[in-house]
Each structure stands twice: as C-alpha cells, then as structure tokens.
C-alpha cells in the first residue's frame, strides 16, 4: 500500500513519515513463505499475518483505501456491524492473547476463580469466526475442549 494518504508529518520529529506497516508485513510474510520452499499464495500470506496486522488492516486509514472490501469476508456479519465493531473485536482478542503471553490472570477476579471473562471471550471469538464461515464452530467442536475444561474447573470450585 503506497497511497499518499499513508504519508503524514510526524509533529515530534518534524519529518514526513509513511505508514507502510501493512506493506512491510505482507513482504515479510512472502519472504518467510518463500524461505520454507513453498509457493507464495494469497492464502498463505493471509494465514501468516498477526493480530497486529489485522488490527491495522481494519483501522480507518487502511480500511478507507480498500473502500470497505475487507468486511466482505464476513459473510454473516450481523446487521449494524461494520469495520469499527470488527476492529474492536480484533483488539479484544489481541489483548487476551497479550494477557496470556504475559502470564496475567484471566480467570481470577478479586483473588477468586471467575471464568466469566474467559467465557465471554470464547463466545466473542466463536461468533467472530461464525461471521466469516458459519459452519466453522460445528467443525471445531470435535476438537474444542475449552467449555468442558471450564465446566470441570467451575465444578471443582463449587466443591
């Protein structure tokens, strides 16, 4: 993405800067795929992207350049939902991932075991995936053990 709208003057350093994060991430993914000795395809480049990439992709400045096309991937996006809601969910998932990576508690509130945040995030992620591919959750349920583990742990807490 080399559009002029991605160039701005950084007030702190008083220099023109180009926001080429998306371009750099795509090129990095292509290089990584090629180094594995496999054909670089659109699907592989997409699969290689991080939550940071998707967060930037759905930010206003990049989204506007693509004239709303990124939302078309969400075949079952609920009425009234759009770029902002999608990006808000990506941010929440990224925050959850970061909390887990930094060993922060996700199942405790006031030193008591509480799975409400985890359950809410599970529902949010499940819904999000369903908006892209409605048949995904029945397929994932065969290998998904999240709800069973939460139920088991909640039952332990009640004893």
Walk through the language-model features, giving the residues of each.
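Amphipathic alpha-helical interface elements
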Residues: 1-159
């Amino acid at each position: 993405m080399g559009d002029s709208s991605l160039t701005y003057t950084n007030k702190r350093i008083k220099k023109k800067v180009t926001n080429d994060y998306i371009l750099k991430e795509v090129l990095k993914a292509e290089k990584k795929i090629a180094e594995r000795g496999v054909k670089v395809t659109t699907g592989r480049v997409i699969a290689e992207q991080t939550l940071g990439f998707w967060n930037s992709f759905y930010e206003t400045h990049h989204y506007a350049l693509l004239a709303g096309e990124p939302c078309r991937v969400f075949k079952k996006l609920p009425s009234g939902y759009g770029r902002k809601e999608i990006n808000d969910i990506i941010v929440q998932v990224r925050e959850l991932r970061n909390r887990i990576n930094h060993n922060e508690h996700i199942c405790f509130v006031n030193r008591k075991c509480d799975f409400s945040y985890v359950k809410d995030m599970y529902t949010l992620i499940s819904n999000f995936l369903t908006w892209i591919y409605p048949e995904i959750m029945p397929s994932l349920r065969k290998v998904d053990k999240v709800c069973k583990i939460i139920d088991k742990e909640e039952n332990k807490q009640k004893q």
